[in-house]
């Protein structure tokens, strides 16, 4: 019989990165925060749903703030000082996420809104009736 190899988790070498990009996707239901390096390689991410909020509480500014703080803690080891923020979507977590990243010790150099806006593209779905 052959011996089984034990799966040992590989230790990742944390490299020093000074500048990063924070991608914030703020939808009406959830907020996703991803911090990458300049090339686009993901360093860490967090969501308001993954931060313990469920249902309608996921879509609150406080849930987005908690997700941003959680993501900031995950990438602290890389030594990121400056962040460029790219925001996408109309959700309620837009401003609170930026405020949380700023208070986490990052210097925000640029804020870019990359919300996709159609130039009269596809026909929108029917009007919602509640």
Curated annotation (Swiss-Prot):
Organism, as annotated: Buchnera aphidicola subsp. Cinara cedri (strain Cc)
Name of the protein: Small ribosomal subunit protein uS11
Gene Ontology MF: a single term: rRNA binding
Assigned protein family: Belongs to the universal ribosomal protein uS11 family.
Gene from which this protein is expressed: rpsK
Metal-binding in keyword set: no
Assembly and binders: Part of the 30S ribosomal subunit. Interacts with proteins S7 and S18. Binds to IF-3.
InterPro entries per record: Ribosomal_uS11 (IPR001971), Ribosomal_uS11_bac-type (IPR019981), Ribosomal_uS11_CS (IPR018102), Ribosomal_uS11_sf (IPR036967)
Function (record text): Located on the platform of the 30S subunit, it bridges several disparate RNA helices of the 16S rRNA. Forms part of the Shine-Dalgarno cleft in the 70S ribosome.
Pfam families, sorted: Ribosomal_S11 (PF00411)
GO cellular component: ribonucleoprotein complex; ribosome
Keywords: Ribonucleoprotein, Ribosomal protein, RNA-binding, rRNA-binding
Keyword Glycoprotein on entry: no
UniProt-listed HAMAP family: Ribosomal_uS11
BP terms from Gene Ontology: translation
